[in-house]
């Protein structure tokens, strides 16, 4: 099968031929129909994460946002059959531990990160293997398009879990979103669908325009002055919930500083080599104003049905964010384009 492999950090991925994965007794082999290209792939390609002992190994097949058709299942799989169309999370749970059984498979202690570790080769490939397939794979409704499902990837699922499950965003809340890339625009669209009012923050005019297109009621150009003051003015006192969707020190601090009393900061963006996993925050202010700081990773596999139902109903449309469909051969260049934020909306691999 054809696959895109990380050979050297920062060097073009090698698109090459590999053996098709074997099927484990509890696993499923999926023919990949589409796979989103994500900034987390860029972080992996750059070799980020060594400061947290989380560096993706060379030799890794990248890609972690697949949708496709089941072509084979192991003898221990009960709920999937060849021909089923499924979406696969990047945070794979074992399905049997206490966290998985209680709905927290996104932080399974025995879990695997699809496309980020050797035991879970990714989906920039013609085929991908899904372990614990009954637990991890979710059927896709017939009316939902392939590219739209791939766009859910880790951007919509990450934004949805953060907003709905961690911060419990509700009607009337003010939500600030710092960084209007894939995760940020997903958060704008989802928070709007939840009845919240959204302020979008970015340095790029086109990104802010895109945020308005998917529901933002106000925007802040981060190049034009103090972001926290601008958000406070737009919201009449500060955001109820604020998300750092980028992971830079500046966006993290701005997110915390723009909250009203008893607000909630959501950290979903991963840091770069500049921050190396650490950002200084005003802890005394967090205490003084009773502020919550929450991390959020992906989404439990068992809660995909909630998000797919939103998509099927038409309340959320991931297809709005898809800017380009590309081939597997183009993936090396599209990752390189992320270095200077030159991608075109959400980009999805649809030709293998």
What are these regions (language model features)?
Residues 94-178:
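NAD(P)H dinucleotide-binding glycine-rich loop of Rossmann-like/cofactor-binding domains
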Residues 232, 274-324, 333:
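C-terminal substrate-binding/catalytic core of Rossmann-like NAD(P)-dependent dehydrogenases/reductases
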Residues 21-35, 50-101, 141-143:
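Glycine-rich beta-strand-centered segment in the early N-terminal region that forms part
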Residues 142-224, 229:
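Mid-domain Rossmann-like dinucleotide-binding core that forms the NAD(H)/NADP(H) cofactor-binding site
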Residues 2-4, 14, 31, 67-69, ...:
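Residues located in well-ordered beta-strands
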Residues 170, 175, 236, 266, ...:
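C-terminal capping/lid region of NAD(P)-dependent oxidoreductase domains
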Residues 5-22, 39-72, 87-88, 108-119:
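N-terminal glycine-rich cofactor-binding segment
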Residues 167, 209, 214-292:
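Glycine-rich cofactor phosphate-binding loops and adjacent beta1-alpha1 units
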């Amino acid at each position: 099968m054809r696959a895109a492999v990380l050979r050297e950090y920062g060097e073009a991925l090698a698109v090459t031929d590999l053996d098709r994965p074997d099927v484990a007794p509890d696993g499923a082999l999926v023919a990949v129909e589409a796979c989103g290209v994500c900034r987390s792939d860029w972080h992996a390609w750059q070799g980020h994460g060594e400061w947290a002992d989380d560096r993706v190994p060379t030799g890794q097949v990248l890609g972690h946002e697949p949708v496709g058709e089941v072509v084979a299942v192991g003898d221990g799989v009960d709920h999937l059959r060849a021909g089923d169309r499924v979406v696969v999370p990047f945070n794979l749970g074992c399905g049997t531990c206490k966290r998985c059984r209680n709905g927290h498979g996104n932080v399974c202690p025995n879990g695997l990160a699809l496309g980020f570790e050797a035991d879970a080769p990714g989906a920039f490939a013609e085929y991908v293997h899904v372990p614990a397939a009954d637990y991890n794979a979710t059927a896709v409704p017939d009316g939902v398009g392939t590219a739209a499902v791939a766009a859910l990837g880790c951007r919509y699922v990450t934004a949805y879990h953060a907003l709905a499950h961690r911060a419990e965003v509700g009607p009337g809340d003010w939500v600030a979103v710092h960084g209007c890339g894939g995760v940020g625009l997903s958060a704008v669209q989802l928070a709007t669908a939840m009845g919240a009012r959204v302020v979008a923050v970015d340095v790029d005019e086109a990104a802010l325009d895109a945020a308005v297109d998917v529901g933002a009621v106000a925007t802040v150009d981060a190049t034009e002055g103090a972001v926290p003051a601008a958000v406070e003015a737009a919201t009449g006192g500060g955001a109820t919930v604020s998300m750092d969707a980028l992971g830079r020190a500046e966006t993290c601090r701005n997110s915390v500083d723009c909250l009203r009393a008893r607000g909630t900061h959501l950290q979903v963006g991963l840091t770069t080599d500049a921050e190396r996993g650490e950002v200084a925050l005003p802890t005394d202010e967090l205490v003084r104003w009773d502020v919550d700081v929450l991390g959020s990773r992906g989404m439990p596999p068992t809660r995909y049905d909630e998000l797919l139902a939103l998509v099927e109903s038409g309340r959320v449309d991931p297809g709005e964010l898809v800017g380009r469909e590309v081939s597997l051969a183009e993936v090396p260049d599209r990752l390189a384009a992320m270095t200077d934020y030159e991608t075109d909306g959400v980009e999805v691999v649809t030709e293998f």
